[in-house]
Amino acid sequence: MKVLIQRVTQAAVDVDSITIGQIDAGILALVGVEKQDNRETLGRMAQKLLKYRIFPDSEGKMNLSLTDTGGGLLVVSQFTLAADTRKGLRPSFSSSAPPDLARSLFDEFVAALRAQHPNVETGRFGADMKVRLINDGPVTFMLES
């Protein structure tokens, strides 16, 4: 599993020109599910995402997590994150989970996040989405299982 997290002052996701998820200050998480991912992977990644310290403390150091700040979390599926780009000029998706498995694991990932954090919004799995954000910093990290 690959989760690209971005610290944002606001973010939203639209499907068919309708906003289906939005947050104020917090994290936008783009999620790519890979073939080898399982429930154990999901649990570890959910914990890491919620506890990863990317927000400034009173001294300006990145020392606070999303759990600490209580900020929003917008989770958007993005299968292209699982692409292998090491060879050639076209991405290979051979390591991406098949759509049915990816949907199931993505839904379980979101459920794990919601069980631990009160403010979780999502996009729509498999939909053509438009994501809007204001990246704060910019602060962006790739979390990998």
Swiss-Prot record:
**Principal location class:** cytoplasm
One GO biological process from the UniProt record? D-amino acid catabolic process
Query: What are this entry's molecular-function GO terms?
Result: D-tyrosyl-tRNA(Tyr) deacylase activity; Gly-tRNA(Ala) deacylase activity; Ser(Gly)-tRNA(Ala) hydrolase activity; tRNA binding
Alphabetical list of SUPFAM superfamilies matching this protein? DTD-like
Motif (Gly-cisPro motif, important for rejection of L-amino acids) on chain: 137-138
Q: What's a Pfam family this protein contains?
A: Tyr_Deacylase
Which reactions appear under catalytic activity for this entry? glycyl-tRNA(Ala) + H2O = tRNA(Ala) + glycine + H(+); a D-aminoacyl-tRNA + H2O = a tRNA + a D-alpha-amino acid + H(+)
Compartments (UniProt record)? Cytoplasm
One Gene Ontology CC term in the entry: cytoplasm
Keyword set, alphabetical order: Cytoplasm, Hydrolase, RNA-binding, tRNA-binding
Catalytic activity, EC: 3.1.1.96
Summary of subunit composition and partner proteins? Homodimer.
Tell me its family. Answer: Belongs to the DTD family.
Functional summary from the UniProt entry: An aminoacyl-tRNA editing enzyme that deacylates mischarged D-aminoacyl-tRNAs. Also deacylates mischarged glycyl-tRNA(Ala), protecting cells against glycine mischarging by AlaRS. Acts via tRNA-based rather than protein-based catalysis; rejects L-amino acids rather than detecting D-amino acids in the active site. By recycling D-aminoacyl-tRNA to D-amino acids and free tRNA molecules, this enzyme counteracts the toxicity associated with the formation of D-aminoacyl-tRNA entities in vivo and helps enforce protein L-homochirality.
User: What NCBIfam families does the database record attribute to this sequence?
Assistant: D-aminoacyl-tRNA deacylase
Q: What is this protein called?
A: D-aminoacyl-tRNA deacylase
